Amino acid sequence: MTTILVAADAKWVRDQVRSAFMSRGQTVVEVTRGQDVRDRFAEVNPDLVVLDMQIGNMGGIAVALDLRLEESGGRLDRANILLLLDRKADEFIGRRADVDLMLVKPVDAGVLRRAAKQLLPAAS
């Protein structure tokens, strides 16, 4: 079973991700606040984390940095992180946050599934 953790305060972003991964053998877990990602990650140990760049007071960049710091401290497993950008120019900061893949919103279900396949070869 593949578990995808999506963090976005915008319902339409969470809906896009959920619709892309609504298939047998896949579970989508949602959080609406960036500060909740670390705890939820520890609970579900997802195969993929999808972060919206703009999430309230702790955005996707800060969350990605937090996950990488927790990983380097041995407190969390390595996370495959897909960052959803607002514009292509944001790729610079995404690279600084050590995310695995970036996509510019809006993205459709097919694009999200192809991105997941790049990060998770066994994902369907």
Task: List the model feature ranges, each with a label.
Residues 47, 51-69:
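Conserved phosphotransfer microenvironments
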Residues 107-116:
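C-terminal output helix
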Residues 1-12, 17-18, 49:
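Conserved acidic segment of CheY-like receiver
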Residues 117-124:
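The C-terminal output helix
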Residues 49, 102-103:
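Two-component signal transduction core modules
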Residues 32-48:
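Acidic, metal-coordinating helix/loop segments flanking the phosphotransfer/catalytic sites
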Residues 62, 83-102:
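Alpha4 helix (beta4-alpha4-beta5 surface) of REC/receiver domains from two-component response regulators
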Residues 72-80:
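His-Asp phosphorelay/catalytic-motif detector in bacterial-type signaling
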